[in-house]
């Protein structure tokens, strides 16, 4: 409808391969007059937007509800995670940051063991999980991590639409799955916020 050319990329190659989606996007931008590669994985404006906008909005809305204790999110480009962590460090330092990470992503092993694997697994949930560490990422801010498999993520997304009328994708289901697992470990009365990265 807008006249753009859609370029499909391979999912079986890693960063550094010319057909990896980010490498190919950078090449297309470099080869196309007037094009610009936004590079959300390395662009400091990505986390800055969440620090300046998303974080204060959550704090303001949750103040009206009596506050909150944790925030659960998935990590793709890391903009949400890094930006919120900066905002909360200044304005709500008591809030725990909880990452919901799909099976196959390298982030769980890196956070839990300090081991950065050069081989990721595969997962079906789109938009979250990593096979590399984005340069815009500050992974040190994560207080807890919960694995969220494909099946449970998609089931939670379906339950979200059936029960709440919110049309959201698998990454939102992962966030719900991670939040449920995290909350089961906590004493009653703790209040989490869960980021659903969909327009639903």
Residue ranges of predicted features:
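Residues at the starts of beta-strands that form the adenosine-phosphate
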Residues: 5, 94-96, 191
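A glycine-rich helix N-cap at a beta->alpha junction
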Residues: 2-24
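Short beta-strand segments
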Residues: 10, 39-40, 73-75, 99-101, ...
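Active-site/ligand-binding-proximal alpha/beta "capping" segment
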Residues: 32-78, 84, 139, 143, ...
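Terminal helix/beta-alpha structural elements that buttress the NAD(P)+-binding lobe
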Residues: 68-70, 95, 170-174, 182
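Short glycine/serine/threonine-rich phosphate/pyrophosphate-binding segments
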Residues: 1, 74-85, 107-108, 171-179
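Phosphate-binding loop/pocket of nucleotide- and phosphate-handling active sites
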Residues: 122, 177-200
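Active-site/ligand-binding loops adjacent to catalytic centers
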Residues: 22, 29, 34, 89-170
């Amino acid at each position: 409808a807008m006249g753009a050319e859609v370029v499909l990329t391979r999912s079986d190659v890693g960063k550094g391969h010319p057909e990896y989606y980010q490498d190919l996007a950078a090449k297309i931008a470099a080869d196309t007059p007037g094009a610009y590669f936004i590079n959300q994985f390395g662009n400091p404006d990505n986390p800055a937007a969440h620090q300046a906008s998303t974080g204060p909005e959550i704090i303001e809305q949750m103040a009206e509800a009596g506050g909150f204790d944790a925030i659960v999110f998935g990590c793709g480009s890391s903009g949400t995670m890094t930006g919120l962590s900066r905002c909360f460090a200044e304005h709500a330092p008591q809030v725990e940051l909880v990452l919901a990470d799909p099976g196959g992503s390298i982030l769980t092993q890196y956070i839990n063991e300090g081991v950065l694997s050069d081989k990721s697994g595969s997962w079906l949930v789109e938009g979250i999980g990593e096979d590399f560490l984005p340069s815009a990422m500050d992974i040190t801010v994560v207080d807890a991590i919960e694995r969220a498999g494909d099946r449970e993520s998609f089931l939670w997304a379906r339950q979200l639409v059936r029960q709440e009328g919110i049309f959201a994708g698998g990454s939102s289901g992962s966030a719900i799955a991670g939040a449920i697992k995290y909350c089961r470990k906590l004493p009653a009365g703790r209040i989490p916020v869960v980021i659903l990265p969909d327009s639903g």
